[in-house]
Amino acid sequence: MSSDKIFAEGESCKSAWHDATAGYDETDTHLEIMGKPVMERWETPYMHSLATVAASKGGRVLEIGFGMAIAATKLEEYNIEEHWIIECNDGVFKRLQEWATKQPHKIVPLKGLWEEVVPTLPDGHFDGILYDTYPLSEETWHTHQFNFIKSHAYRLLKPGGVLTYCNLTSWGELLKTKYNDIEKMFKETQTPQLVDAGFKSENISTTVMDLVPPEDCRYYSFKKMITPTITKV
């Protein structure tokens, strides 16, 4: 039913997202913005998997989307040198600034939509990238990660650098409506776009973990999660 979908046809939150209230619930297990389920604490093992990939080369890591600091906090446990984080929502960015003061590595908080910030970042600057932002429109629901990857991910990475990412809001819908095999979903809907962006298919790998979402999760109901590792050679 269309009423179950996260986005209505033609809906866009982009212009209002910056100022919208960041609704962290009392138990700090859910983050909701403009009525959208942005992140939930049950994702933790998966977020840690993404963070592990992004930190695997050490050095300077770029994280796009701060959310509940689940991946960010895990990244800080690794032997990295700098941790750059892009976040556009005011309330989430405030939490990022507070969190940054308590971390062991140099944090570079960058305020704004990634579309505004990323073009200002230099080529070959990062050893690892973790892209996990929320789709801000029905139009880009399934494709916003490719806009970043095709325009910027390859150029931002150093040779040997690694990219990982997710779009759970998209993948959850695809696994509900079109696919029952998560690896097939990734291979058919993601890999061709990564190759178009300049990455070689032999340098794209995935790992799958079992993780059962709570029954009330609106954006993901599949009982497996997939972590991509995409290396620039």
Curated annotation (Swiss-Prot):
UniProt enzyme class: transferase
Residue intervals of the RMT2 domain: 1-233
Catalytic activity: guanidinoacetate + S-adenosyl-L-methionine = creatine + S-adenosyl-L-homocysteine + H(+)
Example of a GO cellular component annotation carried by this entry: nucleus
Single GO MF descriptor: guanidinoacetate N-methyltransferase activity
E.C. number: 2.1.1.2
Keywords: Methyltransferase, S-adenosyl-L-methionine, Transferase
Positions of S-adenosyl-L-methionine binding: 17, 47, 66-71, 87-89, 114-115, 132
Entries under SUPFAM superfamilies matching the protein: S-adenosyl-L-methionine-dependent methyltransferases
GO biological process: creatine biosynthetic process; methylation
Pathway in which the depicted protein is active: Amine and polyamine biosynthesis; creatine biosynthesis; creatine from L-arginine and glycine: step 2/2
Binding site for guanidinoacetate: 39, 43, 132, 168-169
Complex formation: Monomer.
Family the UniProt entry places it in: Belongs to the class I-like SAM-binding methyltransferase superfamily. RMT2 methyltransferase family.
Protein name: Guanidinoacetate N-methyltransferase A
Organism: Xenopus laevis
Lineage: Eukaryota, Metazoa, Chordata, Craniata, Vertebrata
Gene name of the encoded protein: gamt-a
